[in-house]
A protein has these predicted regions:
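Extracellular/periplasmic, surface-exposed regions of secreted and cell-surface proteins
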Residues: 1-223, 281
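Short, surface-exposed charged micro-motifs
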Residues: 4, 121, 228, 240, ...
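A signal for specific C-terminal beta-sheet/loop modules enriched in small/flexible residues
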Residues: 19, 99, 134-135, 148, ...
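A short local loop/turn or secondary-structure capping micro-motif enriched for an aromatic residue
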Residues: 24-25, 140-141, 248-249, 294-296
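C-terminal beta-signal and adjacent terminal beta-strands/loops
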Residues: 57-61, 139-140, 196-198, 277-306
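Flexible glycine/proline-enriched surface loops and loop-helix/loop-strand junctions
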Residues: 100-102, 257, 267-269
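Conserved small-residue
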Residues: 164, 180-266, 297, 301-306
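Conserved C-terminal beta-signal and adjacent last beta-strands/turns
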Residues: 174, 187, 265-293
Length: 306
């Protein structure tokens, strides 16, 4: 079920709202329904007939302030998490046998996202240059995660809704320019986004199999590794930074798991792209660039070499 309503007054004031009800068979019948909604508002100041705006409107044909708030949900990636699954191809004592391959999580429900955006849209020189700047904040709760369980159950992990959450914050900037005359046309597009994504609400640290850790207050994708301290010139052994039983910093040739620490993050702080198209007398020249920085790349193969 999807409904949406929008209202505009004199092309200056805008309000909108939407409601959506989704149902998914990836959840048990009691938890299939998700009710999601959003509201938005905008104000185009350049449609006001104020004298002091006249010099501004010679450059900016459009200045629109906007804001929105909404609530939505995420599905698990697998289809049958709420059902216990069996494999009938096994054999036991020369006979056929059933083995349990997946244990049901009947209470599984939607991940929840609360999203807030506020920004401004600018149009310059009859929209030949358009700029959109926006701040966003997204709070995700009831995260669907593989949680370690007692191996007496026959499994090492189970998919569950946890108390953990992720708070994403950042800015987004888009620039779109069209420069043309009788002989040539130049289209330019530039976008940039910043991201801060941190965990909260975790009951304990969760160390993944991919050298990353989930810890309250730390970035999503934080690398949790032994920190390299160089090579011992006498023995050729790899050295690591660590801490002794008294809490003193040491350098050791042991890769003791207790020496592991957060040494970086895999999620870029800034990312974006640049796209340009230049046309002249039937000839086209285009280019596309993407970039990201503020993150660390872990090369597992290189990490095992000395």
């Amino acid at each position: 079920i999807v409904t949406r309503a929008d209202y505009s007054y004199r092309y200056r004031y805008f309000i909108g709202g939407s409601f959506r009800q989704d149902r998914s068979s990836r959840f048990s019948p009691e938890h299939r329904t998700g009710n999601f909604w959003s509201v938005s508002a905008a104000y185009r100041i350049t449609n006001e007939n104020w004298a002091w705006l006249d010099p501004v409107k010679r450059i900016f044909n459009n200045i629109k302030f906007k804001a929105s708030y909404g609530y939505n949900g995420n599905l698990p990636s697998k289809y049958y998490n709420w059902r216990t699954l069996y494999n009938g191809s096994g054999r036991y004592d020369s006979g056929h046998a059933l083995s349990q391959t997946f244990r049901a999580t009947y209470d599984l429900s939607w991940e929840k996202n609360n999203v807030f955006n506020v920004g401004v849209d600018l149009g310059m020189f009859r929209d030949r240059i358009r700029i959109s700047a926006e701040y966003y904040s997204r709070k995700s709760t009831d995260l669907l995660q593989e949680v370690p369980v007692s191996q007496v159950s026959g499994y090492s992990t189970m998919l569950m809704n946890t108390s953990a959450g992720i708070r994403n914050r950042g800015f987004e900037l888009d620039l779109d320019a069209h420069i043309l005359n009788k002989l040539f046309k130049w289209d330019l597009k530039l976008n940039m986004a910043t991201l801060s994504a941190k965990y909260f609400g975790l009951e304990q640290d969760i160390i993944g199999s991919n050298a990353q850790i989930m810890r309250n207050g730390q970035s999503v994708g934080a690398w949790y590794l032994n920190k390299f301290a160089g090579i011992d010139s006498n023995t050729g052994q790899v050295l690591y930074y660590g801490v002794d039983e008294y809490g003193n910093d040491i350098i050791s040739n042991s890769d003791n798991p207790s020496f592991r620490r957060i040494v970086g993050k895999g999620v870029p702080t800034v990312s974006g792209g640049f796209n340009t198209l230049f046309s002249y007398r039937g000839w086209d020249l285009s280019a596309l660039f993407t970039y990201a920085w503020g993150h660390d790349v872990y090369d597992s193969r290189a990490a095992g070499r000395t």
